[in-house]
Amino acid sequence: MARKPDIRVRRIYEEPSPQDGTRVLVDRIWPRGLTKGNAALGEWCKQVAPSTPLRKWYDHDPARFEEFRRRYRAELEQPQRAAALQHLRELAKDRPLTLLTATKHPDISEAMVLADLLRT
């Protein structure tokens, strides 16, 4: 039986943890006030980020989250995004994967949608 992937979602501004495993930023825009040198990232996978029109429409409005989730999952079926999603699956095969976002509410972010997809 295959091991269930250990996927975590955290804010990039939080202190890194030894349990984070591979740390991947999944936002399209680089986080304010953070230098690339102090980000403690494995990589920045902006190919899986929501499109700019979808991100602007959503605007982290909790009332729009379910519709955002539906639209974003549809975007993730596009070839370039699907390939990036598969890359994240590969990263999560053998060690924990922490998806990082700058949003103040990671539980209603693209990182949470990605984590749910990667866990299935």
List where the protein language model places each region.
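Residues lining hydrophobic/aromatic ligand-binding pockets adjacent to catalytic sites
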Residues: M1-T120
